[in-house]
Amino acid sequence: MSDFDFDAALRWARFDPYRTLARRQDEELPFVSDRADSGQDILLDTCVYIDGLQGRAPEVVADLLDIRISNHSTVAIQELMHTVGVLDPKHPGTKGAVRQIGVTIMDMKPHRIFAPDPDVLGRAALLSGMLCRLQGYEKDARLRALQDCVLFLQAQKLGFTVLTANVTDFDYLLQLIPTGRALFYRATQQV
C-alpha cells in the first residue's frame, strides 16, 4: 500500500478556481515589518539563503532569524546544490560561492532539517500542475513552481510559516490555499 492516497489528493484539490490568478497588492499580503517580532517557526525558502549570501537580505530578516526558530527543507538543500552544479568551474568567483554555499548547508542544524513525505510530494505535484495551468507557466517556471509548492505544503503540514522574497508565486499559493502561511520580505540592492 502506498503512503500516498491518490483519491484523497483529488478530493483535496477541489479548490481549483479554473481561472488565472491576479497578484494582490502588497498591502494585502503578510510582509515582515520594520522590526522583527516573535511568532511561529519559519521554514526558509531558498531565496533567503541566496539573498543572505549575496548581501541582499534586509537587516530585519537577520533579526527575524535570531528571534524565531528557523527550519530548513531538503528542497532548499537540493536547490542550493543545483546552484553548485550550475556554476562554471572556470569562473573566478565559483570557488568562493561554492565554499559559501557549503558553509550555509553545514550550518543547518540536523534536527531542524525536514524532508517532505509522499503525501506532501504528491499534493505539491498536483498543486503545481494546477498553478502552471492557471498561470500559463512554461519550462523553467514549472520546476520552480513544483519546488515552491513542495515547500509551501511542507510548511503547512509542519505548522511553519514560509519566509520568502518570492512574493508573486507564494501569493498565488496563499490564494489557492488560504490556510497556508507565508511571510514576505523585499530583497535589497547589493551594495
Stretches found by the model and what they are:
Residues M1-E79, V84-G102:
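Short, well-structured N-terminal submotif of metal-dependent ribonuclease cores
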Residues M1-S33, F152, Q156-V191:
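Acidic, PIN/NYN-like endoribonuclease modules and their adjacent C-terminal/linker elements
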Residues S2-A9, L21, E27-L29, V84, ...:
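Active-site neighborhoods of divalent-metal-dependent phosphate/nucleic-acid chemistry enzymes
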Residues L44, H72, A115, L146, ...:
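Short beta-strand scaffold positions
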Residues V48-Y49, V120, L151, T168-F170:
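Alpha-helix capping/helix-boundary segments
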Residues E79, R123, Y172-L173:
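Phosphate- and divalent-cation-binding pockets in alpha/beta enzyme and binding domains
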Residues L87-P92, C132, G180-L183:
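Short, hinge-like loop/turn segments at secondary-structure boundaries
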Residues T104-M108:
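Acidic, glycine-rich loop-and-strand cores that form catalytic or ligand-binding grooves
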